[in-house]
Amino acid sequence: MKPTTIASLQKCKQDKKRFATITAYDYSFAKLFADEGLNVMLVGDSLGMTVQGHDSTLPVTVADIAYHTASVRRGAPNCLLLADLPFMAYATPEQAFENAATVMRAGANMVKIEGGEWLVETVKMLTERAVPVCGHLGLTPQSVNIFGGYKVQGRGDEAGDQLLSDALALEAAGAQLLVLECVPIELAKRITEALAIPVIGIGAGNVTDGQILVMHDAFGITGGHIPKFAKNFLAETGDIRAAVRQYMAEVESGVYPGEEHSFH
């Protein structure tokens, strides 16, 4: 199978073809996703909650991310694999580069970091040294204590303009992908249209170039609070492989996420 690359996603944006992505944490699920043609995966620091049982992503370490990245890579050798740099792993550009090298050696193709314009020098540091970067704006879970909980971001003109400014700054610094989480659909549309790079949404409506879901949300095995943007595809299909195919089909057609999964 031909490897999926950032160029593959760039072509999807150019062709206005929506694409699905998903989190993965181990060999078995990564292989299953790849076998069904879902070839863009993220080893997210969400593993702190879904795999380790913490109440936030903050306890996750670079070693944790590297371990799970290596497992996923073995299951999906040709996927485009993103890996989060976890909380306090990129406080300085130099620290970011050192930790990015660790997860890249484990098998990642790209690192994802949360934050806006303050990350410009870090993004430049990484991309100039051959480390591809995916930005992450909106509800950035590592900032949960600043936000006072998991809340929609970017509502109102000032907040929306700031997120757009952040997105443009990250792109100008060299970021090649952007994740937008829990923002109003109208703002997601503005940002997606303003950027040349692909934008992946989660809780950002069906107007972004791609979608991502935490796999546990997609299969209805999340404990506790279920996010508004989540959909249990396993409940509809009764089979994990069929659920993966249904998720991909609904993303590609624009059926998911629907109005009931979106914010304004």
Swiss-Prot record:
Positions contributing to Mg(2+) binding: 45, 84, 114
> What are the record's GO terms for cellular component?
cytoplasm
Keyword annotations of the record? Cytoplasm, Magnesium, Metal-binding, Pantothenate biosynthesis, Transferase
Among SUPFAM superfamilies, the record links this protein to: Phosphoenolpyruvate/pyruvate domain (SSF51621)
Q: What residue ranges carry the coiled-coil annotation?
A: none
Its chief place of residence is: cytoplasm
> What pathway annotation does it carry?
Cofactor biosynthesis; (R)-pantothenate biosynthesis; (R)-pantoate from 3-methyl-2-oxobutanoate: step 1/2
List residues binding 3-methyl-2-oxobutanoate.
45-46, 84, 112
Catalytic activity, EC = 2.1.2.11
Instruction: Kindly indicate whether the keyword Protease belongs to this entry.
Output: no
What InterPro entries has UniProt attached to this entry?
Pantoate_hydroxy_MeTrfase, Pyrv/PenolPyrv_kinase-like_dom, Pyrv_kinase-like_dom_sf
Q: Name one GO biological process term.
A: pantothenate biosynthetic process
Example GO molecular function? magnesium ion binding
EC class of this enzyme? transferase
Q: Where is the active site?
A: 181
| Cell compartments where the protein resides | Cytoplasm
Alphabetized Gene3D superfamilies for the sequence: Phosphoenolpyruvate-binding domains
Explain how, and how many, cofactor molecules are bound.
Binds 1 Mg(2+) ion per subunit.
Name its co-factor(s).
Answer: Mg(2+)
Catalytic reaction equation(s):
3-methyl-2-oxobutanoate + (6R)-5,10-methylene-5,6,7,8-tetrahydrofolate + H2O = 2-dehydropantoate + (6S)-5,6,7,8-tetrahydrofolate
The record's NCBIfam families line, in alphabetical order, gives: panB, PRK00311.1
Q: What does this protein do?
A: Catalyzes the reversible reaction in which hydroxymethyl group from 5,10-methylenetetrahydrofolate is transferred onto alpha-ketoisovalerate to form ketopantoate.
Complex and partners: Homodecamer; pentamer of dimers.
Family that this chain belongs to: Belongs to the PanB family.
- Specify the protein name: 3-methyl-2-oxobutanoate hydroxymethyltransferase
Q: Which organism is it from?
A: Shigella sonnei (strain Ss046)
